[in-house]
């Protein structure tokens, strides 16, 4: 089975999962964090080099204040809880997103986990937090304009533009998985997903299993990736 180098996941459906069970939405987020923990282990078993998890979008600030505060706390708790696994399995963590507007406890944990895991090289776990694809592109344009205004000469190509993205050295996702039955990217990795293969599950994220993950990987391994060209020239 051909294994993708980079898998990205839109972990959707936590709130609906909780609602269906008559539980507070935060219970869905807690269960979702457990499934992410499992997905990291499955990815390690398969030899996947990069795993990106869409955890908190720039649009999620519109949610109720109590839920947003819980998600901030959950980020900190999740990093603390996973440190043993990260060290043991040599998993590097990088955060993809904007620091503006985040509470100090989140910024501190962001810096801490990136620093503590920066030398690990078995797999890179990328947590998209306070992230929006359009905002990333706009930020890149602003950085380019700033450099030009300071006298830097820039030949604008796809590759030079890429250098202004949040994590320019991370390869584009080979496969993007989305749960919950929604069939859209929802402002996720808009630049990087140009040639990504997509796989959609009707299941809600807290119900996602290893069998589901393997099914998506198997589907990917059977696809022919043309990148706009032809397979045989």
Swiss-Prot record:
Binds 2 magnesium ions per subunit. Its EC number is 2.5.1.-. It holds the Pfam family Prenyltransf. GO terms for biological process: polyprenol biosynthetic process. One of its GO terms (molecular function) is magnesium ion binding. The active site is at residues 12, 60. Its cofactor is Mg(2+). Mg(2+) binds at residues 12, 197. Keywords: Magnesium, Metal-binding, Transferase. It is an enzyme of class 2 (transferase). Substrate binds at residues 13-17, 25, 29, 57-59, 61, 63, 178, 184-186. Coiled coil: none annotated. InterPro entries: UPP_synth-like, UPP_synth-like_CS, UPP_synth-like_sf. The keyword Manganese does not apply. Signal peptide: none annotated. The keyword RNA-binding does not apply. Catalyzes the condensation of isopentenyl diphosphate (IPP) with allylic pyrophosphates generating different type of terpenoids. Belongs to the UPP synthase family. NCBIfam families: PRK14830.1, PRK14841.1, uppS. Homodimer. This is Isoprenyl transferase.
């Amino acid at each position: 089975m051909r294994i993708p180098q980079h898998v990205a996941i839109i972990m959707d459906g936590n709130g609906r999962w909780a609602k269906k069970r008559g539980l507070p939405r935060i219970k869905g987020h807690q269960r979702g964090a457990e499934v992410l923990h499992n997905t990291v282990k499955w990815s390690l078993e398969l030899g996947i080099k990069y795993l990106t998890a869409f955890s908190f979008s720039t649009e999620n600030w519109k949610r109720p204040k109590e839920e947003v505060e819980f998600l901030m706390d959950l980020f900190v708790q999740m990093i603390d809880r996973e440190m043993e696994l990260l060290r043991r399995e040599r998993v590097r963590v990088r955060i993809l997103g904007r620091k503006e507007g985040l509470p100090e406890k989140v910024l501190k944990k962001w810096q801490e986990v990136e620093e503590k895991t920066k030398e690990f090289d078995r797999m890179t776990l990328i947590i998209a937090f306070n992230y929006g694809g359009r905002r990333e592109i706009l930020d890149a344009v602003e950085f380019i304009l700033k450099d030009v205004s300071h006298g830097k000469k820039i030949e604008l190509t796809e590759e030079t533009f890429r250098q202004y993205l949040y994590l320019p050295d991370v390869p584009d996702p080979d496969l993007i998985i989305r749960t919950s039955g929604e069939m859209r990217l929802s402002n996720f990795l808009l630049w990087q997903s140009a040639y990504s293969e997509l796989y959609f599950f009707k299941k809600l994220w807290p119900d996602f299993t290893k069998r589901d993950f393997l099914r998506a990987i198997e589907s990917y391994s059977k696809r022919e990736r043309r990148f706009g060209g032809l397979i045989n020239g």
